[in-house]
Amino acid sequence: VRLQRQVVDYALQRRALLAEVYSGRTGVSDVCDANPYLLRAAKFHGKTSSVSCPICRKEQLTLVSWVFGDHLGAVSGSARSAEELVLLATRFSEFSVHVVEVCRTCSWNHLVKSYVLGAVRPPKGSRTTRTARNGARTASE
């Protein structure tokens, strides 16, 4: 069963931003601006990746997953572990997840990808049609 839908990858945007930093057109302080809440979420809810920080190169980046959705209530806007995401996907209808990479040393952070999780809502006004498989008569009967 495929859980992630409507996946958006921000790798090209990340590459362009890093090119700006490496060329000197964008300052390091402009991209190393993770707030304390994000850094704390990385410490307690994040998953260490195999990618080292592109700015300081001192440590592996940490991936933090943030959930958003009106029907999530107080959970919306919070960081969640992979295990919690699976649990939320079984309990709630569609909600979005934003994965941010963060360096806990220099505060580099960037959106890596976003996707939708949760039960798929049937389209409004859709009806189930009877087919030969679910009991309708066929022309040969």
Task: Give the location of each predicted region.
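Short cysteine-rich clusters marking metal-coordination/redox-active sites
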Residues: C53-C56, C103-C106
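Short cysteine/histidine-rich metal-coordination sites, predominantly Zn2+-binding motifs
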Residues: V67-S78, G118-S126
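N-terminal alpha-helical interaction blocks
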Residues: V1-P36
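Long, charged interaction segments in nuclear RNA/chromatin-associated proteins
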Residues: R2-R5, G46, P54
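Short, non-ligating residues that shape and space the ligands of small metal-coordination modules
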Residues: E59-L63, N109-Y115
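C-terminal/domain-terminus segments
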Residues: R2-V8, K113-E141
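Short Fe-S-cluster ligation motifs
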Residues: R80-V97, R137
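Short, flexible, mixed-charge glycine/proline-rich loop motifs
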Residues: P36-S50, R91-V97
